[in-house]
Amino acid sequence: MDETSADQGAVRLVHDDDRDRFAAYEGGTVVAVLAFEDEGSVRDLRSTVVAPERSGRGIGAAIVRFALEDSRERGLSIRPTCWFVRGYIERHPEYADLLETPETAPDKE
């Protein structure tokens, strides 16, 4: 597990590179996961899942923001496959510069 983490109130956010995910913990319990796959210089943010009983508390937004900041620090472009991530970036245009472009897309040859 990557030691990159941040505290968001009672929620701890962790970059779990071994499992290709970001995770949000309350105590020792995983309450949200954002799955990704790195393809060269592009990080595909594939899906975001928040435990139903934790929905509506901003945990999804916090984990997406954490993933975007981590990607920025690592110099990665973003492919927002996940609808929740796409919506977050639309509402927060300060992350639009991270979006994958034809120049940053990995070769598919």
Regions found by a protein language model. Name each.
Residues 29-37, 44:
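Conserved beta-strand in the GNAT
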